[in-house]
Curated annotation (Swiss-Prot):
The keyword Hydrolase applies. It is found in: Cytoplasm. It catalyses: Release of the N-terminal residue from a tripeptide. InterPro entries: ArgE/DapE_CS (IPR001261), Bact_exopeptidase_dim_dom (IPR036264), Peptidase_M20 (IPR002933), Peptidase_M20_dimer (IPR011650), Peptidase_M20B (IPR010161). PANTHER family: PEPTIDASE T. The lineage of its organism: Bacteria, Pseudomonadati, Pseudomonadota, Gammaproteobacteria, Vibrionales. The active site is at residues 80, 174. Belongs to the peptidase M20B family. NCBIfam families: peptidase-T (TIGR01882), PRK05469.1 (NF003976), PRK13381.1 (NF009920). One of its GO terms (molecular function) is tripeptide aminopeptidase activity. This is Peptidase T. SUPFAM superfamilies: Bacterial exopeptidase dimerisation domain, Zn-dependent exopeptidases.
């Protein structure tokens, strides 16, 4: 445990921001550089089957220390950070024994305020690690990596703690939805696994959104504005008309819990051609289909009213709710709950308003719920993490390994 924070601070110095505009895997060279460091650390630990492929998938195994059969289990985290904010030159700040109030981030005007982020009210007395207000922190998901390796170190240093084979996997490009694309489940070797990619202490998640992306392309007619009457069709106006027809009360900023949404995420505007990029989210598969059908209906209605110009819709499913793949194995969830309770952590079972590698992996034959890291406000400059919650995550990982062995002994 003594090296947990040191590991984390070392890991966040690596710029591993993934790039959605690059097709190759990994999408950024920094991820491979970071993977090489982690590979060497795992070799130094004496782990077996340490492999790093050309795409940045890093795997290893801590062999069983018992003389009876225990199902191999896995722990997974991702090496990339989100494209939403810079992950270069991360300069973490320490806030020891936080007692409330605003936290100044660096030398600028940015602050971390409990008014805006009420979770801080519950963290009095905690040691916090924040950003300096210019980058994200990278707790998503380098905290998960540090916690997994710290748990492995604890198991190695305490051979009296029984465990079966522990499989470790670190993936690239999770933040751009590709983390499971080239993951070799058979090679990984676990019967089930846990991603260590959640937020506050106690989070245990085995439900996530069903997800799709939608590109709406508006084809206009460009004519010199001086002679445009009755001829021009401005694709930007078509795009604006379409967005106005979308449900205003079903967006990320107006929904919570099990409520789905449409999210206008990107746009390219021009007279002859405009394009709007959406993501569609719903916890129910039928609800996802209804949302897709609504967008198609709006497109069809617009096309029916156009004499010139047209609207085109392309929808691609991204991932599905892992619940249907995890629920048939209730012992996986029960084991994590028991481990948390044994570590004085109250399990907080809640849906993931997003996705994880585990969602895709669950549909690839590796049931894979998600467990907390202790981090908050991922993907932005107000990201921070509690050291005490990081330590609890390590203990929960160790306890899961121990309970798995004891239940099969």
């Amino acid at each position: 445990m003594k090296h947990l924070v040191e590991r984390f601070l070392r890991y966040v110095t690596f710029d591993t921001q993934s790039n959605p505009h690059v097709a190759q895997c990994p999408s950024s060279p920094g991820q491979l550089v970071f993977a090489e460091l982690l590979k060497q650390e795992m070799l130094d630990f004496g782990l077996s089957d340490v492999t790093l492929d050309e795409h940045g998938y890093l795997m290893a195994k801590l062999p069983s220390n018992v003389d009876y059969d225990v199902p191999p289990i896995g722990f997974i985290a991702h090496m990339d950070t989100a494209p939403d904010a810079s992950g270069k030159n991360v300069n973490p700040q320490f806030v020891e024994d936080y007692q409330g109030g605003d936290i100044a981030l660096g030398l600028g005007d940015e602050v971390l305020s409990p008014v805006q982020y009420p979770d801080l009210h519950n963290l009095h007395g905690h040691n916090l690690i924040t950003t300096d207000g210019t980058t994200l922190l990278g707790a998503d998901n380098k905290a998960g990596i540090a916690e997994i390796l710290s748990a492995i170190a604890m198991l190695i240093e305490n051979p009296d703690i029984p465990h079966g084979d522990i499989c470790i996997g670190f993936t690239p490009d999770e933040e751009i939805g590709r983390g499971a694309d080239l993951f070799d489940v058979e090679k990984f070797g676990a019967k089930w696994a846990y991603t260590i990619d959640g937020g506050p202490q106690g989070e245990l998640e085995y439900e996530n959104f069903n997800a799709a992306s939608a590109d709406v392309i508006f084809h206009g007619v460009s004519v010199h504005p001086g002679t445009a009457k009755g001829k021009m069709v401005n694709a930007m106006n078509l795009a604006a008309q379409f967005q106005v027809k979308m449900p205003a009360d079903q967006t990320p900023e107006t929904t919570e819990g099990y409520e789905g949404f449409f999210h206008l995420k990107s746009g390219e505007l021009g007279i002859a051609r405009s394009e709007l990029g959406y993501i569609i989210r719903d916890f129910d598969r039928e609800g996802l289909e209804e949302r897709k059908a609504l967008m198609q209906k709006l497109v069809d209605e617009m096309n029916a009213g156009l004499k010139h110009g047209s609207v085109e819709l392309n929808i691609t499913d991204s991932y599905y709710n892992m619940r249907e793949m995890v629920e048939p194995y209730p012992h996986i969830i029960e084991l994590a709950k028991q481990a948390m309770e044994a570590c004085d952590v109250e399990p907080l079972i809640k849906p993931i308003r997003g996705g994880t590698d585990g969602a895709r992996l669950s549909f690839m034959g590796l049931p894979c719920p998600n467990i907390f890291t202790g981090g908050f406000n991922f993907h932005g400059i107000h990201e921070f993490i509690s050291v005490e919650m990081m330590e609890k995550s390590v203990l929960v990982i160790v306890k899961i390994a121990e309970l798995t062995a004891k239940k099969h002994g």
